[in-house]
Amino acid sequence: MISLFISNFSNLSNLSPTFDNMNMNIPSKKIVPVPTPSEKVVSLVSRTGRDLQRYNTAGYRQVVGCVPYRYKKHGGGEIEVLLISAQKKGKGMLLPKGGWEIDESIEEAALRETIEEAGVTGQLEESLGKWQYKSKRHTMIHDGHMFPLLVSQQFEIWPESEFRQRKWVSLSEAIELCQNSWMREALEAFINRKCQTQ
């Protein structure tokens, strides 16, 4: 419809001699391609609220996260893990995780949460498993699904960069610093898998 209007408008000079007499410059019709995204664009704003949260049949909130890792440069294949600070100061270091929502796959949720909280992305690997844990207030049980993520890109600015710190640490430091017992178990599962493949 718009292109038809532009086409008709640009042909008005042929229909009315007064346009020539007025010495007007009428732009010629241009076809401007509309960019089509080939991949999803990641928002720089974290999702908030629980309206889209996924729960299992027992009422357990479904949470998903990652063990972001990389191979240390000049480290002979040594692995480093990325930990993030808790939102509240003094609550220690954690792995990135958050709610799995009903409009996304478990893999999409894992990548989204890791970008939002840690500002990294990369190659998601096979799930490490599922751990049950109690919420902060100990009133609700959550299922925590964790995936290894081989980091290929680290962003300088990310959705939660204003109130989270991040730190690359050795595997032993990660076990020592990680505050949540279920996350330490996920780290141990990750270490066991990597030991078997090396």
Curated annotation (Swiss-Prot):
Coiled coil: none
Pfam families: NUDIX (PF00293)
Binding site for Mg(2+): E113, E117
PROSITE patterns documented for this protein: NUDIX, NUDIX_BOX
Record's GO cellular component terms: chloroplast
Keywords in alphabetical order: Chloroplast, Hydrolase, Magnesium, Manganese, Metal-binding, Plastid, Transit peptide
Primary residence: plastid
Domain Nudix hydrolase: 59-191
Targeting signal (transit peptide) range: 1-37
Cofactors named for this entry: Mg(2+); Mn(2+)
EC numbers, comma separated: 3.6.1.-
Entries under SUPFAM superfamilies matching the protein: Nudix (SSF55811)
Entry similarity comment: Belongs to the Nudix hydrolase family.
Name under which the protein is recorded: Nudix hydrolase 21, chloroplastic
Organism of derivation: Arabidopsis thaliana (Mouse-ear cress)
Gene: NUDT21
